[in-house]
Regions:
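Conserved Class I S-adenosyl-L-methionine-dependent methyltransferase catalytic core
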Residues: 1-5
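Conserved SAM-binding loop
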Residues: 7-16, 20-129, 156
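General small-molecule cofactor/ligand-binding pocket signal
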Residues: 70-72, 171-174
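Acceptor-substrate binding/catalytic loop of class I
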Residues: 121, 141-158
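Residue-level marker for beta-strand->alpha-helix junctions and adjacent short loops that shape enzyme
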Residues: 124, 178-180
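Short, flexible, mixed-charge acidic loops at enzyme active sites
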Residues: 129-138
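Short alpha-helix
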Residues: 151-167, 173
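Core SAM-dependent methyltransferase catalytic element
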Residues: 185-196
C-alpha cells in the first residue's frame, strides 16, 4: 500500500530499487518495522522515536541486516535537521501524542512541498474503543492496558481540518482492517476502527 502510493504519487518507475534517492522520515519508528523495508527498496531512511529503548533495538536490527538507516531518539517537534523529506510515515502514532496540532505542524515543516505524508491512526468511534481498547488491551491482551487513550483518537474529519491549517491536503482516505485468522492487515472501505 505504502510503496504503491509513493510510486504513483511521486511518479517513480517500479525498478529493482524503486525508492532510490527518496528521503523518508519514519516517525514513531519503533524497532524499524517500516524503516527496514523502505531502506531495502532503496530509500534514504531516518527513523525517529521518543523511546530510547526502541531506537536501540532498531539500530541493532539495522546493523545486523546491514541496512544504512539513521535512527534518533526524538520527536518531530524537537528534531533538528536541514533535510526536507519526500515521504513522512506517521503510522499508528497520532493517537499517542499530547498535541496533535503541534505534532502535525512540525511534520509539515519537515515535508517537501510536493511530498507525501501517510497518517494511519484509530478513529474516534465506539467500535474503535471496543476493538482497540477493550478487545486488544483487556480481552486479548495483545497490548499492555493503558496503551491507548480513547480521548486521543482522531476522527478523519478532524484530521483533515488540522492538515488544512498546514497547507496539507488529503489525497485518499482508506479503512484498514485486521484479519485475526490470517494475522494480516488489508485495505477496507470500513474506516470505523483504523484508517490511513
Amino acid at each position: 500500500y505504502i510503496k504503491e502510493n509513493i510510486l504513483s504519487t511521486l511518479n517513480l518507475k517500479n525498478k529493482k530499487k524503486p525508492l532510490e534517492k527518496i528521503k523518508i522520515l519514519d516517525i514513531g519508528c519503533g524497532g524499524g518495522l517500516l524503516s527496514e523495508p523502505m531502506s531495502r527498496l532503496g530509500a534514504e531512511v531516518i527513523g525517529i522515536d521518543a523511546s530510547d529503548k526502541n531506537i536501540k533495538v532498531a539500530k541493532l536490527h539495522a546493523k545486523k541486516n546491514d541496512l544504512h538507516i539513521k535512527y534518533y531518539c526524538t520527536s518531530p517537534e524537537n528534531f533538528i535537521t536541514k533535510t526536507k523529506f519526500d515521504v513522512i510515515l506517521n503510522m499508528e502514532i497520532i493517537e499517542h501524542v499530547e498535541d496533535v496540532n503541534n505534532f502535525l505542524e512540525s511534520c509539515s515543516r519537515l515535508l517537501k512541498k510536493k511530498g507525501i505524508m501517510f497518517v494511519a491512526t484509530l478513529n474516534k468511534t465506539l467500535k474503535s474503543y471496543l476493538f482497540a481498547i477493550v478487545g486488544a488491551e483487556y480481552i486479548l491482551q495483545w497490548l499492555p492496558i493503558g496503551t491507548h487513550e480513547w480521548n486521543k483518537f482522531v476522527k478523519p474529519e478532524d484530521l483533515i481540518n488540522i492538515l488544512k491549517k498546514y497547507n496539507l491536503k488529503l489525497d485518499s482516505l482508506d479503512g484498514m482492517k485486521f484479519n485475526i485468522i490470517k494475522d494480516e492487515w488489508s485495505v477496507s472501505s470500513d474506516k470505523s476502527i483504523n484508517y490511513i
